[in-house]
Amino acid sequence: MKTPIDQLLAEHRIIEKALRALAGLCERLERGEQVDPDAFDRIFEFLMTFADRRHHQKEEKCLFPALGAQGVPRDRGPIGVILQEHCTGRALIAQMRRAVSAHANDQFIEAARAYVDLLSEHIQKEDNVLFRVAQTLLDERSMRSLQDDFNQAEAELPGSLAKYEQEAQEMERAWAV
């Protein structure tokens, strides 16, 4: 039976596809290729909707409180680090958007590369540290409650997991180098 942690791990694999697509956009710009402006809108929408509003919000509003109930502090340790990285990621997306609006390819590439690096390392921390802590601390009852919280959070958001997975695959096929 899949646990809520398994769901978060699966979402990471989807986000990694989008990160490869974003890195591919950077490589194309570095080679002097033209990139369709819609590509930027599409990747930003995916990162803001799926990675941040769907995935990060399930962590921040569901998983972290469940871990807090088990004594894991929110403001320091692994959760504190993860929260700071979520904020940094949001700031980098804003930077990328400003760079695209200003037609500043170098600034976009710098922010996008920083975002890819940040999220790649961030995912490794969650997969190998935070989620293992969760699997150790959360009993079956807590996992069921967490699953209920995830279901409620997802019901409030647009789109299905399958839709986002397809979107990430399409972007990766189109732009990853």
Where are these regions (language model features)?
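Small-residue-biased structural context
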Residues: M1-V177
